[in-house]
């Protein structure tokens, strides 16, 4: 009997550029050593008009069969494709990379694809750098839907507990 867990991770992954994408790639490499990991990646993160840099992409070509690049936060049809992917994989754990409340709608939708007790969110930033109006309200709703919050420092832990003391 295998003790390997089936894990689906959701978040930016190369060829999308940026620190969170690079972190996600490293996380998947480590988790894959002892687990069966599939990645649900974004086709794009933001509309071109909102993207602050030259390009969202690097020259990196991902050759992994475990990466499914279908999500677009502004295309609801991609949300259904992502949900289907999660249900088909039937993972033991779902790990979402969170860094901006812009992604809360798609993430809340995708959380409905897996039963409670298996929903983990890795918070890179609890409060986005822009600190938008209503951000804490939506974060509170989001945190209620997840089973485990993973933070990288005490500051983010404190923010999560201020938003939802039961987290």
Language-model features: locations:
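A short, glycine/small-residue-rich beta-strand->loop->alpha-helix junction that serves as a flexible
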Residues: 11-25, 47, 99-104
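N-terminal strand-loop element at the rim of the active site
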Residues: 13-17, 29-86, 156, 161
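Conserved alpha-helical elements of sugar-nucleotide-dependent glycosyltransferases
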Residues: 19-30, 106, 134, 138
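Short N-terminal targeting/anchoring amphipathic segment
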Residues: 67-73, 81-105, 118-120, 148
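Active-site proximal beta-strand in glycosyltransferases
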Residues: 93-95, 111-129
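Nucleotide-sugar donor phosphate/pyrophosphate-binding loop at the beta->alpha transition
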Residues: 115, 126-145
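A short, active-site helix/loop in glycosyltransferases that binds the activated sugar's phosphate group
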Residues: 146-167
């Amino acid at each position: 009997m295998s003790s390997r867990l089936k894990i689906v991770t959701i978040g930016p992954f190369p060829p999308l550029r940026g620190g969170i994408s690079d972190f996600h790639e490293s996380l998947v490499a480590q988790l894959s050593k002892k687990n069966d990991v599939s990645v649900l990646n974004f086709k794009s993160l933001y509309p071109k008009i909102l993207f602050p840099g030259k390009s969202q992409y690097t020259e990196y070509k991902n050759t992994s069969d475990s990466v499914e690049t279908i999500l677009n936060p502004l295309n609801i049809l991609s949300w259904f494709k992502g949900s289907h992917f999660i249900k088909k994989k039937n993972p033991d754990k779902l790990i979402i990379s969170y860094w901006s409340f812009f992604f809360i709608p798609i993430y809340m939708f995708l959380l409905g694809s897996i039963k409670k007790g298996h929903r983990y969110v890795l918070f890179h930033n609890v409060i986005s750098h822009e600190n938008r109006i209503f951000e804490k309200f939506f974060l509170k709703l989001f945190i209620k839907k997840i089973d485990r919050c993973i933070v990288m420092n005490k500051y983010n832990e404190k923010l999560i507990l201020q938003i939802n003391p039961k987290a």
